Amino acid sequence: MTFALYLSPRKAFATLALAGACVGVCTGAAWAQSPAGEPAALHQVELPLPSGIVLRAHWWPAPRPSSAQANASVQPAVLALHGCGGLYAKAGVLSSRYRETAETLHAAGYAVLMPDSFGSRGLRDVCQTRYSDRSLNVNDRVQDARAALVWLAAQPGVDARHIGVMGWSNGGTTTLNLLVQRLIHPREGEPTLAGAAVFYPGCGPLLKHQAVAESVPLLMQLGALDDWTPAQPCVDWACTLKARAGSDVTVHVYEDSYHGFDGTAPVRLRGDVPNGTSAHGVHQGGNPTARVQSLASLQSFWKRVLGTPTAP
């Protein structure tokens, strides 16, 4: 088991690579055509849930391989989970973060599924609602994700052995809790996961309860200055995962970076968010250096755990 700390020349990020020990650091029906401004390959689908909720999702099937590569009939896929602000910008189209992610993954040959947990329940966002007052909790979103994974694995053209899941903020928290719940309450027919990647999740409850997660390759990308979902609980929780044989956890902590460091908007104080470490609000916004580094790390991670898809 190895532990390594890496700093870029400008100290843009620190990498906590935990290969097993921490040393000194603790099939729905299409319901609409692609909206204007969305990627051309986009389909919108509906996934009926056992609860009676119909989960809407955005679906980008992987590009078809050329005729010369027709034997490569299945491609890897990624399930992507939105944050507390929901999937959409004010104009009603996918926000730039999710649109960019979908386009990048799709161009690389991956299928992409993005469930809309909020819109499916008549919600736009929950960022301004205290955790204790939210009508939709993380466990609800975990159930959404589990149903979405089953649907995704059943789609023609998807390699059910190579499915990854990722999430940002509340979606990252959901991703981590998904790994915990799949270990505690396994379900017959669920696909295995090839890997999971999260941006700035909330890890406090996981650390408090010393939760144990499904052992899959895990990439955690955190902001050192995050006062909304602080990095340290995630670093500490990642260290507890070392106790499991064969653990594969990598944590990147980006210096001078707040919540949303992978975005392009400038950092601002959000006094409307009551869930941070300060009563005065939280900071949110991008860090150009951390953005480049984190997106490159994400791309490398997917190549490692999902493989390189057959080019269309």
Segments predicted by a language model, with ranges:
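Conserved alpha/beta-hydrolase "acid-adjacent" motif
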Residues: 227-235
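Primarily recognizes the serine-hydrolase "nucleophile elbow" in alpha/beta-hydrolase
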Residues: 89, 136-214
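Serine-hydrolase catalytic machinery in alpha/beta-hydrolase-like enzymes
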Residues: 55, 65-153, 265-266, 271-284
